[in-house]
Swiss-Prot record:
NCBIfam families: 3a01208. It holds the Pfam family ABC_membrane. Heterodimer of TAP1 and TAP2 (TAP1-TAP2). A component of the peptide loading complex (PLC), interacts via TAPBP with MHCI heterodimer; this interaction mediates peptide-MHCI assembly. This is Antigen peptide transporter 2. Residues 1-6, 78-98, 170-187, 288-293, 396-408 are lumenal. One of its GO terms (molecular function) is protein-containing complex binding. ATP binds at residues 503-510.
C-alpha cells in the first residue's frame, strides 16, 4: 500500500465524515435500535463509500481497508452480545459516538495500514491491477478443459456425494454421546452406529472416485497444454529463442504446465468442496445453536485479514522461486551440454560453484517461504484455538441453561473444527489458485505470441530450376537493428554451378545461408528463387528444395534411419541407403550391428566427427534438393567422398553454395564471392587487399 499518496485517504476521510453527519441527522432515526441498526449503519457506510470511491477512481488505493473501517464497530459489539452476561450488551453507533470513539476507529485503520505497509512485499500494490486479469485467465483455463468435461462432471458428482455423506457423521457422533449420557437405548445406539458407518463408507468411496476422476482429467489437461505449448514454441521466429533462455522455456514446459493442469483438478476441486461443505456445515450448526454459529462467524474476518497480509508475500516469493529454479536448471543444462568444453578448460569446480550459488539462492527463497508459511499457520492455529475456547465458554452457559445438550455441543465443536479447516483450505487454495493462474499467464503469453514471420506461401511448382538471386539485399538482426550485417548484396547462384562464399569471421556468410533458408527476412531488397520471392514458397516444399549442411551438424537421439529421414514421411529404406551411399556413409553404416536401425546416442555421441558429417549430408541428399548449402560441411571428408558429392551435384545441374575457408574448396568452385563487413568485395578491390581471403581467391584465379 502506497503511503505517499495522501489524496485518496483525505477523500475517504471527508466522505466518511459527511456520511456520518447525515446518519447523525434525521436519517439516523430511521435505523432500528440495537445490533441490527449497528450492522445496518456499517453496511450503509461500506456501500456508499465503496460506490463513491469507485466512481472517483480511488477504490484500488483504499478499498482494502473499507470493511475494516465500517464493520469493526458492529463486529465488536456483536462479540460482546454473543459472549453473554460477562460483558455489557449496550451498543454505540459511530454516527452518534463521541470524537474519542471516532478517533479510535480511525486509529485502528491507521494502525492496520502501517502493519500492511511493513508486511506487504515491495510492489504488491502495483501488481494488483494486473491481477484483474485473473478472471479472464480462469475462464480460459475452463475453456481449455472443455474436452474433459464428461470426466469433470463425474468428478463433481462424486464430490457432492462425498460432502453430503461427510456432513452427517458429526450429527450421529453427537447422538451417540447423548445416548450414552442419558437413558441407554440399545436400538437407538445401534441405529446411530450403523448410520455413522454407512456415511463413513459412502464418504470414503465417493472421495476415492472423486480423486481418481480429477487426477485422470488432470493428466489429460497436462498433456494437452504441453503439446500446445511445444507446438507454439516450434513455430516462433529465431529472434524469440535468442532473447529467451532455454532454462526458462524448460521451466514453462515442465513446472508451469503442471501447475496449470492442477488448477481445476486440485485447486478448484478443493475450493468447491470446501465451499460447499462450509455452507452445509453452517446449516447443521444453526440447527444446533444459532448463537454459537454467529459467534463462530466472527472468526472469518480475522482469517481473511491474515490472508490479505500473507497471500501477497507468498505470491511474490513463489515468483522469485520459479525464476531461481529456472536459473539453476540453466546452469545444469549448460554444464552438461558443454561437458567436453568444461573438461577441456578444467572448469569443473567453476561450474560446481555456479550451481552452488544458484542452489543457495533457491535455498534462501525456500527458507523464506517456509518460515512465512509457518508463522501464518501458527497465527491461524492460535486464532482457531482462541475461538474454540470462546465457544466452549458460551457453550457451557447454554448447557447450564438447558439450551444445548452435551452431545449437541460435541457435534457443534466437531462441525466448528471442520469448518475452520475448510475455511483455511478456502483461503490457502485461493492463494494457490492465484499462483497457478500466474503460471498460466506465462504459458498463455507464449501460446498467444505471434512469430514475426511473413504469411506462409503456397508456391510448390513441380519443377524447380534452382536459380537464386540476391537483389540489393540488406539485413540486420532484430535484436540489433542499428547494426547492419549485410548491405546491398547483389549476386546470382546458377544451377549446375558451385559458388564459394569466403570472408573473415563476422562478415555475414552464415547470415546469407540463413536468409536462403527463409529463417530471417531481408530488411531491404529481394531474395528470389526461380524469379519468385522466397517467402511465397510453401514452407515444407521450400525446405525440401533448399537444404543446409552445417559445419557442426546437429543429430538427434535415435537410429541412423531416423536421422537421415528426419522430417520426411514414408521414407523407404532404399531411399535412405541411396542417400547414405551418395554421402559415402554406407561403408560405416554397413559395419554397424543393426545397420540403418542402429542407435547413435544423444546428439550422435557414438559417431566420429566425419561420420556425423556424412550422416548430415545424407540427410540433405535424401530430399533430392535443387539448392544445397554447405557451411564448411566437408572439412572432415576425404577426397573420395568430396568427389562423390561433386558427382551427385553435377547429375541434375543442382545449385551449390559452399561457405569455404580452405583453398581446396575455393579452387573447385565455379564462382567465388568474397564478403567483408557485410558487403561484396569487387575483383579490383580484391587485388589491393592483403588478407588471407584475398590471397585464397588470387591463388584460385591464377590457377
Amino acid at each position: 500500500m502506497a503511503l505517499s499518496h495522501p489524496r485518496p485517504w483525505a477523500s475517504l476521510l471527508l466522505v466518511d465524515l459527511a456520511l456520518l453527519g447525515l446518519l447523525q441527522s434525521s436519517l439516523g432515526t430511521l435505523l432500528p435500535p440495537g445490533l441490527p441498526g449497528l450492522w445496518l449503519e456499517g453496511t450503509l457506510r461500506l456501500g456508499v463509500l465503496w460506490g463513491l470511491l469507485k466512481v472517483g477512481g480511488l477504490l484500488r488505493l483504499v478499498g482494502t481497508f473499507l470493511p475494516l473501517l465500517c464493520l469493526t464497530n458492529p463486529l465488536f459489539f456483536s462479540l460482546r452480545a454473543l459472549v453473554g452476561s460477562t460483558m455489557s450488551t449496550s451498543v454505540v453507533r459511530v454516527a452518534s459516538a463521541s470524537w474519542g470513539w471516532l478517533l479510535a476507529d480511525y486509529g485502528a485503520v491507521a494502525l492496520s495500514l502501517a502493519v500492511w505497509a511493513v508486511l506487504s512485499p515491495a510492489g504488491a500494490q502495483e501488481k494488483e491491477p494486473g491481477q484483474e486479469n485473473n478472471r479472464a485467465l480462469m475462464i480460459r483455463l475452463l475453456r481449455l478443459s472443455k474436452p474433459d468435461l464428461p470426466f469433470l462432471i463425474v468428478a463433481f458428482i462424486f464430490l457432492a456425494m462425498a460432502v453430503w455423506w461427510e456432513m452427517f457423521i458429526p450429527h450421529y457422533s453427537g447422538r451417540v454421546i447423548d445416548i450414552l449420557g442419558g437413558d441407554f437405548d440399545p436400538d437407538a445406539f445401534a441405529s446411530a452406529i450403523f448410520f455413522m458407518c454407512l456415511f463413513s463408507v459412502g464418504s470414503s468411496l465417493s472421495a476415492g472416485c472423486r480423486g481418481g476422476s480429477f487426477l485422470f482429467a488432470e493428466s489429460r489437461i497436462n498433456l494437452r497444454i504441453r503439446e500446445q505449448l511445444f507446438s507454439s514454441l516450434l513455430r516462433q521466429d529465431l529472434a524469440f529463442f535468442q532473447e529467451t533462455k532455454t532454462g526458462e522455456l524448460n521451466s514453462r514446459l515442465s513446472s508451469d504446465t503442471s501447475l496449470m493442469s492442477q488448477w481445476l483438478s486440485l485447486n478448484a476441486n478443493i475450493l468447491l468442496r470446501s465451499l460447499v461443505k462450509v455452507v452445509g456445515l453452517y446449516y447443521f450448526m444453526l440447527q444446533v445453536s444459532p448463537r454459537l454459529t454467529f459467534l463462530s462467524l466472527l472468526d472469518l474476518p480475522l482469517t481473511i485479514a491474515a490472508e490479505k497480509v500473507y497471500n501477497p508475500r507468498h505470491q511474490a516469493v513463489l515468483k522469485e522461486i520459479q525464476d531461481a529454479v529456472a536459473k539453476a536448471g540453466q546452469v545444469v543444462r549448460e554444464a552438461v551440454g558443454g561437458l567436453q568444453t568444461v573438461r577441456s578448460f578444467g572448469a569443473e569446480e567453476q561450474e560446481v560453484r555456479r550451481y552452488k550459488e544458484a542452489l543457495e539462492r533457491c535455498r534462501q527463497l525456500w527458507w523464506r517461504r517456509d518460515l512465512e508459511k509457518s508463522l501464518y499457520l501458527v497465527i491461524q492455529r492460535v486464532m482457531a484455538l482462541g475461538m474454540q475456547v470462546l465457544i466452549l465458554n458460551v457453550g457451557v452457559q447454554q448447557i447450564l441453561a438447558g439450551e444445548v445438550t452435551r452431545g449437541g455441543l460435541l457435534s457443534f465443536l466437531l462441525y466448528q473444527e471442520e469448518v475452520g479447516h475448510h475455511v483455511q483450505n478456502l483461503v490457502y487454495m485461493y492463494g494457490d489458485m492465484l499462483s497457478n493462474v500466474g503460471a498460466a499467464e506465462k504459458v498463455f503469453s507464449y501460446l498467444d505470441r505471434r512469430p514475426n514471420l511473413p504469411n506462409p506461401g503456397t508456391l510448390a511448382p513441380p519443377r524447380l530450376e534452382g536459380r537464386v538471386e540476391f537483389q540489393d539485399v540488406s539485413f540486420s538482426y532484430p535484436s540489433r537493428p542499428e547494426k547492419p550485417v549485410l548491405q546491398g548484396l547483389t549476386f546470382t547462384l546458377h544451377p549446375g554451378k558451385v559458388t564459394a562464399l569466403v570472408g573473415p569471421n563476422g562478415s555475414g556468410k552464415s547470415t546469407v545461408a540463413a536468409l536462403l533458408q527463409n529463417l530471417y527476412q531481408p530488411t531491404g531488397g529481394q531474395l528470389l528463387l526461380d524469379g519468385e520471392p522466397l517467402v511465397q514458397y510453401d514452407h515444407h516444399y521450400l525446405h525440401r528444395q533448399v537444404v543446409l549442411v552445417g559445419q557442426e551438424p546437429v543429430l538427434f537421439s535415435g537410429s541412423v534411419k531416423d536421422n537421415i529421414a528426419y522430417g520426411l514421411r514414408d521414407c523407404e529404406d532404399a531411399q535412405v541407403m541411396a542417400a547414405a551411399q551418395a554421402a559415402c556413409a554406407d561403408d560405416f553404416i554397413g559395419e554397424m550391428t543393426n545397420g540403418i536401425n542402429t542407435e547413435i546416442g544423444e546428439k550422435g555421441s557414438q559417431l566420429a566427427v566425419g561420420q556425423k558429417q556424412r550422416l548430415a549430408i545424407a540427410r540433405a541428399l535424401v530430399r533430392n534438393p535443387r539448392v544445397l548449402i554447405l557451411d564448411e560441411a566437408t572439412s572432415a571428408l576425404d577426397a573420395e567422398c568430396e568427389q562423390a558429392l561433386q558427382t551427385w551435384r553435377s547429375q541434375e545441374d543442382r545449385t551449390m553454395l559452399v561457405i569455404a575457408h580452405r583453398l581446396h574448396t575455393v579452387q573447385n568452385a565455379d564462382q567465388v564471392l568474397v564478403l567483408k563487413q557485410g558487403q561484396l568485395v569487387e575483383h579490383d578491390q580484391l587485388r589491393d587487399e592483403q588478407d588471407v581471403y584475398a590471397h585464397l581467391v588470387q591463388q584460385r584465379l591464377e590457377a
